[in-house]
Amino acid sequence: MSASVLIIYTGGTIGMKEDPMDGTLKPFDFSQIKAEVPELNKFAVRIDSYTFDPLIDSSDVEPSLWISLAEIIRDRYEEYDGFVILHGTDTMAYSASTLSFMLEGLTKPVIFTGSQLPIGVPRTDGKENLISAVEIAAAKDEKGHARVPEVAICFDSQLLRGNRCVKYSAEAFNAFASPNCPPLAEAGINIRYNTDLIRKPIYWDAQLRVQTRLDTRVSILKVHPGMTPQVMRSVVCDPLTRACILETYGSGNALSRDWFLDILREAAGSGKILLNVTQCKSGTVNMDLYATGASLKHAGVLSGVDITTEAALGKLFCLMGRNDNNDWVKTMLEKDLCGEISK
């Protein structure tokens, strides 16, 4: 065998098949994955599986799942060349984003995938997604290094950087989009890798470092017409949080009213971390472009550049878990740590 891949099944639609007795969808035994997807036998890859018990509906995902995933990968890191994580689509972008920050010094592929239809139904997209994910997780270059040493999402013939993804559709097979970062690879007759976009480790023999301490004291405020000072204050100034993600209009704009800016200054003055993320799916925050954006900057709000809300949340969880000093966290927030923002 030229490579070995561990498939980790957390739950989700992809692992279901119809029970011939009553017609209901039930999870199948992933130790028999090659029987369910015989196309995998054509790869010279050793495939093992690990199944969560109980399985997790992705709507119920908590940080404890991310910690478990990181520990599973850490404990089996030397045994496998790559990892495929099967996950429900609803929160896959959150999980892929956060795991990208938790796994430092990554030199092997960690590929998330899932499906819109179960593997056990005729028109499933699950088989193609799984086959492509396994092939990418096992792929090596001419030097024997992993072709994609990143956390990524493989869906509908595209490989997308995990911390750049958003769920795009609840129904279409192309469920995920990466508006601000082109695909890392595209699967057609062959898999075409966009090697210039794929991040490479500084040292291929680097030791994997796993960050399992997460601080989840983060709130999210979506700026909207009609928002009242009372509502804003309850979110931004909540004493139980260390940070607040502000989802703003366009290039990072928001209200210019005095009460709005006063609340931001109050929160920032108390040490709260305030991060500006655009509500737009594509584009970037530029607080120097308009007066309303500049007023946020002067009030102590940091630019999230073109980070997604999912990645901003995971980045804050990890940075705050690593250090209790909010000034350090603010400094690190503005750095590109693993391809999550354009610099």
Could you describe each region identified by the protein language model?
Residues 1-75, 262:
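ATP/NTP phosphate-donor binding region
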Residues 16-17, 91-96, 126-130, 253-256:
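Short glycine/serine/threonine-rich phosphate/pyrophosphate-binding segments
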Residues 2, 8-12, 30-41, 161-251, ...:
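Accessory alpha-helical/coil subdomains and C-terminal extensions
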Residues 8-10, 85-87, 111-114, 152-156, ...:
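Short beta-strand segments
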Residues 85-108, 256-263, 292:
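Short Gly/Thr/Asp-enriched flexible loops that form oxyanion-binding sites at enzyme active sites
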